[in-house]
């Protein structure tokens, strides 16, 4: 979200269309998910299958009048015994700075295990601070200590459905999986012990959790490289996560879904 559609970069101010109506009056979600991306490569072998897509953003895109910064977006999806991996690359093709605040509206079905029950789902999100949001779902710039409600995420006790999780936004940190460092979230079916693990690269510094009022059989642990409205905040960039890509440079992130099954006793 960008308040009032304004995006303040270091070298320009862009006015994006407001597509989140009053009382919010924000620009939300961007436009890339509404574009047809070209498949430029696909193949499969005994180890994996992959597909690579590309979208070239330039003056031919109707959004260019709002954000006249040329770039290329490339997505590579790889499916193997290591899980489902997504590599994202944004290359700045312009002669000005490319504002970068990347997020995924990741959605997980509930239940996610055959025969599972929604009430058995537990979500672990490694977090350190709560990012307070106002009534327009914009940061107040206050980072708050975790309450008992918030600690349910950190301690793996949060059921992310059957109750409202409405834009719970946090500063992320590195957690643990099987004794190793793990930068991501873990959804577990407590009845079976089966885990769905969602690993993200270190560029993703924040998490926001949303579940569409909790009764629609899905939940969204959404990784973000920057806070909501990050370029417009007065906080330092090392706090907000906002960054800019120089002309000719590339910004790259990585995500991976994989499963963990409970150990089988012999």
Language-model-detected regions and their locations in the chain:
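A short, structured loop/turn motif at beta-sheet edges
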Residues: 8-13, 40-51, 78-83, 112, ...
